[in-house]
Amino acid sequence: MVAGTRCLLALLLPQVLLGGAAGLIPELGRRKFAASWPGRSSSQPSDDVLSEFELRLLSMFGLKQRPTPSRDPVVPPYMLDLYRLHSGQPGAPAPGHRLERAASLANTVRTFHHEESLEELPEMSGKTTRRFFFNLTSIPTEEFITSAELQVFGKHMPEALENNSSFHHRINIFEIIKPATANSKFPVTRLLDTRLVTQNASRWESFDVTPAVMRWTAQGLTNHGFVVEVAHPEDSYGASKRHVRISRSLHQDEHSWSQIRPLLVTFGHDGKGHPLHRREKRQAKHKQRKRLKSSCKRHPLYVDFSDVGWNDWIVAPPGYHAFYCHGECPFPLADHLNSTNHAIVQTLVNSVNSKIPKACCVPTELSAISMLYLDENEKVVLKNYQDMVVEGCGCR
């Protein structure tokens, strides 16, 4: 284990010495933790301490238990692009106005794939219709949905242009109010969104389904799913039917289908912290004077998720630079120590009365990180976590 993680355990361990918990850290991670514990003989942490340590970290991440993916996770490319965008990575796609608006009100993004065992609705002349059901029960009750969109992939169909056929067709998205019955072949629906799309490019088409998802989650109405209807022009029925990928091809493998299958994306806020934002690289602050080596300042601390065996459910990042504050707050306090008036007074009193403690070196500025992970239900989640990175230290 890297030295930084030892510091993390040393810094956080006093907060978790409150009792035992079920074993959560995988055996590999447990051995790495124990092997790195200072002293390592009689002083190394017990299984109960390690378990409680991880339990507290999971609670900080808003998880009740450690996710245990059953197989290699399928992460939609959309979520990887969204993570790169909000973590400020180079090469991230430019955000659209709609995405920026949705993310500006949310600190959590979740994705859902539909259940593929549903029946195909009766075919109508010139139209292809499918019923889609997305199980949203994994959304926490305290999470308020601010926006939701249904994404459908459209494949470039050059033959439509070669045959001089129309390369436009309409996609309609309906909410199912009442499902089909024995007496009625068609469900009762409500139109949510509609768009005229073209076949001259391969791209994702996004449709606003916020009203339906809010009714299901906030108002507790029954989720009967959606109907996706593709209206084909008479001269391009075959091409447009192949263009919009709302069902899996007969011989299509699982991996390729997972990259283009319909996707429901929800944007929500759990009432904690700030919404997602595009992280910009911070400019280094100019030092006003040469600091003493022992004075209060920020030190390196890298948290590697593989050291506790979490790399099987945390997709990105593999770790992050958390940093920590350490050092002396000597009298008199210099300007660069970013002190409060109270800290200045306390340090002054300490200089004449040693019973009064000195001011402490603590974080004065913290920033958030974005994490992409699989939750307990193997749903892909992008979440913004506040106060994870120390940006500045001072005497307080």
From Swiss-Prot:
Record localization: Secreted
Propeptide cleavage-removed residue intervals: 24-282
PANTHER family reported for this sequence: BONE MORPHOGENETIC PROTEIN 2, TGF-BETA FAMILY
Location of Phosphoserine modifications: 87
Disulfide bridges in this chain: 296-361, 325-393, 329-395
Swiss-Prot/TrEMBL keywords: Chondrogenesis, Cleavage on pair of basic residues, Cytokine, Developmental protein, Differentiation, Disulfide bond, Glycoprotein, Growth factor, Osteogenesis, Phosphoprotein, Secreted, Signal
Glycan-carrying positions: 135, 163-164, 200, 338
Gene3D superfamilies: 2.60.120.970, Cystine-knot cytokines (2.10.90.10)
Signal peptide range: 1-23
Main location: secreted
Organism of origin: Dama dama
Biased amino acid composition, Basic residues: 274-293
Protein function: Growth factor of the TGF-beta superfamily that plays essential roles in many developmental processes, including cardiogenesis, neurogenesis, and osteogenesis. Induces cartilage and bone formation. Initiates the canonical BMP signaling cascade by associating with type I receptor BMPR1A and type II receptor BMPR2. Once all three components are bound together in a complex at the cell surface, BMPR2 phosphorylates and activates BMPR1A. In turn, BMPR1A propagates signal by phosphorylating SMAD1/5/8 that travel to the nucleus and act as activators and repressors of transcription of target genes.
UniProt-annotated stretches for the region Disordered: 272-293
Kinase recorded as keyword: no
One biological process term in Gene Ontology: ossification
GO molecular function: cytokine activity; growth factor activity
Protein name: Bone morphogenetic protein 2
